[in-house]
Amino acid sequence: MGANVLIMAGGTGGHVFPALACAREFQARGYTVHWLGTPRGIENDLVPAAGLPLHLINVSGLRGKGKLSLLKAPFVLIKAVLQARRVIRQLKPVCVLGFGGYVTGPGGVAAKLSGVPVIVHEQNAVAGTANRLLVPLAARVCEAFPDTFGASQSRRTTGNPVRTELFLETPREALAGRKARLLILGGSLGAEPLNKLLPEALAQVAPELRPEVFHQAGKNHDEVTAERYRAAGVEAQVQPFIKDMAQAYGWADLVVCRAGALTVSELAAAGLPSMLVPLPHAIDDHQTRNAEYLAREGAAFLMPQRTTGAADLAARLTEVLMQPERLDNMAQAARRLAKPGATHDVVNICLEVAHG
């Protein structure tokens, strides 16, 4: 067994999936990977399923909490730091790599107190609270999007680690002589505004121009979304989940979705044009900043939810569906932004820090 590495990531798939990609790379290089998480996050399902040992500490977020919770917060955080420090003393990792989530703050402090180098990776264009607080303690700071952390000698722009199978190598089937294919992603829990907006918008696109539609509506949202399409007179395949994202991306010519960091990175990896509707109440409006990264380079349209109605979306869809060459140009722009070496680069940075 090789030396230990400790990964800290929790809460959402946006933190956990890039961390899993790095875990696999560490393992391929002979390292033993352990994971630090919290009892309530998605890591409790994904990490054991990946065959990785999961260590838990008790910590949660502070935003929006009542006065009593805020009074207790220092004691909760101190306890979490002590829990994390026990794990670190037991494992003696050569480095600790944090991807965000509530676990990252106490875990990073514990690593620093234990003399173990800390590396931070931020997936979004706006850094999360835990990662921002850890920057002064970190030996290196990796960012997916340029200038997330500003000028710093410890900063490295790496991109987001994504699954290698998403970097599509086979050319996409030419649009000539067939209908375009539209992929709509609502996320695992469903983006209800998109589930309502798309059937209405597609009904306003001329039938001869209307694309084939595959709509991932989210858990418990597929039946009502399918009924909306039927009522609108639009043919669509609606599913709650997509098991094979590489296949779905390979099928699509255009994607409508939110602008989570991982989604934006996957769109670039797959070389797909997109219409991005950022989640309007995302913390620090980070999804808008993520979307701007693709939109600035001509790879996506940024369509704010508050100002985008069915008629607006229908007009934009009609515009690009009438110009296949524009979709091609957007796809090429997306591909130029892809970072196929992100996983390799993040792991290299960790090992350079760990071994000097």
UniProtKB/Swiss-Prot annotation:
Q: In which pathway does it act?
A: Cell wall biogenesis; peptidoglycan biosynthesis
InterPro entries linked: GlcNAc_MurG, Glyco_trans_28_C, GlycoTrans_28_N
Recorded topology in the membrane:
Peripheral membrane protein
Recorded GO cellular component terms are: plasma membrane
Q: Where can this protein be found? A: Cell inner membrane
Instruction: Indicate yes or no for the key word Cell membrane.
Output: yes
- Disulfides per UniProt: none
Q: What Gene Ontology molecular function terms does this protein carry? A: UDP-N-acetyl-D-glucosamine:N-acetylmuramoyl-L-alanyl-D-glutamyl-meso-2,6-diaminopimelyl-D-alanyl-D-alanine-diphosphoundecaprenol 4-beta-N-acetylglucosaminlytransferase activity; undecaprenyldiphospho-muramoylpentapeptide beta-N-acetylglucosaminyltransferase activity
* Family recorded in the similarity comment: Belongs to the glycosyltransferase 28 family. MurG subfamily.
UniProt-recorded name of the protein: UDP-N-acetylglucosamine--N-acetylmuramyl-(pentapeptide) pyrophosphoryl-undecaprenol N-acetylglucosamine transferase
> From what organism does this protein derive?
Pseudomonas fluorescens (strain ATCC BAA-477 / NRRL B-23932 / Pf-5)
